[in-house]
From Swiss-Prot:
PROSITE patterns the record matches: TRANSKETOLASE_1 (PS00801), TRANSKETOLASE_2 (PS00802)
Organism for this UniProt entry: Cutibacterium acnes (strain DSM 16379 / KPA171202) (Propionibacterium acnes)
SMART domains in the record: Transket_pyr
Gene Ontology cellular component terms for the protein in this record: cytosol
Protein name per UniProt: 1-deoxy-D-xylulose-5-phosphate synthase
Cofactor(s), by name: Mg(2+); thiamine diphosphate
Domain of life: Bacteria
Molecular function as annotated in GO: 1-deoxy-D-xylulose-5-phosphate synthase activity; magnesium ion binding; thiamine pyrophosphate binding
Length: 627
């Protein structure tokens, strides 16, 4: 792309602070053009970052990063921050191996303090840092940028409740309101009241008045009425009561696309010396007509797109698991009036939108509140409904206690459907859905299935909604759904997919890796028996019988090896006094860097070549031991 007069000279936040206000405004336009050009080629979170350009510029002009930590909640709004901290050149390989992460990354820059990309955690991080700096006498301000739905998460409000009781913390909370959570309010009087309320002289005067008035008869009541009247006037003007009632000072609303206005608000907040909320109004997808016009999500996350029209350039990869689930839910909804859908701020991504269109009164979107989603679903089950909770696999982590103690302990007939299970790839460590089976495996009575194709998915979903005495979990991957796989025979909950010798190598696979396992067989010199359980947890009798007859077992899964399918099978055999050599192929117990799903799977030996190699190595080892 052509040289950008301002952006090309930005190497660090000091360069941003040297700009005039007019230059800062011009820089914002250059950054938008840069983002549209780069992200349209690589994919990524485009809409959220287009909405925070001026805000991020203002943050770096007012605060001294990294001395003053800037923490981005969920992290997907950090692209502009990366650009202003010297990483613009890395956008050529955004979310690719060796390139920039799509989220803050401590390995990339000292300006990135927190890299967890799950929502609603920034305020807890910020409070902890601010307390640490205060206790050590350090003159540093911590900034947390939260919004884009993250304030619907309970953890954020737990933090706000704690922060409200921590006066003296140099903590600025920027609420990035992109119009999807609050009603915008503007007005000169409201702005003046905000300035007055954060003026230290005003606070001193208020304290003096309180001491003077409350010494008199009825003084406390009079002061309370005066303070309530003042608060009521401001709340009526700008609707900040939800924050001020907590005891946290509030500034705003501020036009988030006016650099000077945002700077002035941030300067006031910085000078105040106590926790302050700065309410900034922004437009998601700002400056890209196609994004602003997209009512569904304003191009929240895109693949490769046309940088002018916004049209997707991604080649069709066939039907997705999400689409298959969506269709199955619509069919279930027509037959079963007790079926309800539950989601955590992801109605469209998880495939519940078609069901909601048919049955709007039978869908509950709880916001970014997975804990609440699972327990609310348990309550629905207790009342006679059968809820289907659809989440991304990685977000089930946040609701484990509710799964264990609310759904599990109460034998609740709740079905949890986990999209994006296994390796997701480009979004990095925090978004891989590799933890779910290990967690689910310790919930007594829970049943889990990893369907291998559409017919298997539809079948187990129909079975799951008929189970009313325990939670059920269905997990599937981000990849396109494979063609239906032929079943040779079935017995005791186990499907035989390739009929090799029963006393030879038993290759056990589930989910998306069944197709890879069958492809691996074609690369082997000797026959192998391939089986797949209809329900992976608990281990079915058919799998135990097959493993007991086999010479050795190789298990293949796109979840953690620890507490995975192979380890559960080994434990089931051990409980029966049996033992067989078992080689478990899966994801190691470590965090994985961002890359394409296919590249990571190949690196871990979970593609057909890697599976074939593992089988060959096991056979060679056995032949060597017993020759």
């Amino acid at each position: 792309m052509p040289r950008m007069a301002l952006l090309d000279d930005i190497g660090c936040p000091d360069d941003v602070r040297k700009l005039t206000t007019k230059q800062a405004e011009d820089l914002a336009e250059e950054i938008r053009a840069f983002l549209i050009d780069k992200v349209s080629r690589t994919g990524g979170h485009l809409g959220p970052n287009l909405g925070v350009v001026e805000l991020t510029i203002a943050l770096h002009r007012v605060f001294d990063s990294p001395h003053d930590p800037i923490i981005f909640d969920t992290g997907h709004q950090s692209y502009v921050h990366k650009i202003l901290t010297g990483r613009a050149n890395g956008f050529e390989k955004l979310r690719q191996r060796g390139g920039l992460s799509g989220y803050p990354s401590r390995a990339e820059s000292v300006h990135d303090w927190v890299e967890n990309s799950h929502a609603s955690a920034s305020l807890s991080w910020a409070e902890g840092m601010a307390k640490g700096f205060l206790s050590q006498g350090e003159d540093r301000t911590v900034v947390a940028v939260i919004g884009d739905g993250a304030l619907t998460g309970g953890m954020a409000w737990e933090a706000l409740n704690s922060i409200a009781d921590q006066q003296g913390l140099r903590l600025v909370i920027v609420v990035n309101d992109n119009g999807r959570s609050y009603t915008p309010t503007v007005g000169g009087l409201a702005n003046q009241l905000a300035i007055i309320r954060t003026d230290p002289h005003y606070e001193e005067a208020l304290d003096r008045m309180k001491r003077h008035v409350t010494d008199k008869p009825l003084g406390k009541q009079v002061f309370g009425l005066m303070h309530a009247a003042k608060a009521g006037v401001k709340d009526a003007l700008i609707g900040n009561g939800i924050f001020s009632d907590l005891g946290i000072k509030y500034l705003g609303p501020v036009d988030g696309h006016d650099v000077l206005s945002v700077e002035r608000a941030l300067e006031l907040a910085k000078r105040y010396g106590h926790p302050v909320i700065v309410h900034v109004m922004t437009t998601k997808g700002k400056g890209f007509a196609a994004a602003e016009a997209n009512e569904e999500d304003h191009f929240h996350a895109v693949g490769r797109i046309d940088p002018v029209t916004g049209a997707s350039l991604k080649a069709s990869g066939g039907a997705s698991w999400t689409q298959a689930f969506a269709g199955a839910m619509v069919e279930l909804g027509e037959r079963r009036p007790d079926i309800v859908g539950v989601t955590a701020a992801m109605l469209h991504p998880v495939g519940l939108a078609p069901f909601a269109a048919r049955h709007p009164d039978r869908v509950l979107d709880v916001g970014i509140a997975e804990q609440h989603a699972v327990t609310s679903a348990a309550g629905m089950a207790a009342a006679g409904l059968h809820p289907v909770v659809a989440l991304y696999s990685t977000f089930l982590n946040r609701a484990f206690d509710q799964l264990l103690m609310d759904a599990g302990l109460h034998h609740a007939g709740v079905t949890i459907v986990l999209d994006r299970a296994g390796i997701t790839g480009t979004d990095g460590a925090s978004h891989n859905g590799m933890w779910d089976m290990a967690m689910c495996g310790i919930v007594p009575g829970l049943m889990l299935s990893a369907p291998r194709d559409r017919q298997h998915l539809v079948s187990v979903l129909n079975e799951a909604v008929d189970i009313d005495d325990r939670p059920t979990v269905i997990r599937y991957s981000k990849d396109p759904i494979p063609d239906d796989i032929r079943i040779v025979t079935s017995h005791d909950g186990l499907d035989v997919l390739c009929d090799g010798p029963e006393d030879g190598i038993l290759l056990v696979a589930h989910g998306q890796l069944c197709a890879e396992a069958l492809a691996a067989v074609d690369q082997l010199d000797s026959p192998v028996r391939v089986v797949s359980p209809r329900w992976s947890l608990p281990v079915c009798g058919g799998l135990i019988e097959e493993a007991a007859r086999a010479r050795a077992v190789v298990s293949v899964e796109d979840g953690l090896v620890v507490s995975g399918l192979g380890s559960h099978l080994a434990d089931a055999l051990s409980q029966r006094g049996m033992w067989r050599p078992i080689r478990s192929l899966g994801i190691p117990q470590r965090y994985l860097d961002h890359d394409s799903r296919s590249a990571i799977m190949a690196e871990l030996g979970l593609d057909s070549r890697g599976i074939a190699d593992a089988v060959s190595q096991l056979v060679a080892q056995l032949d060597g031991e017993y020759s």
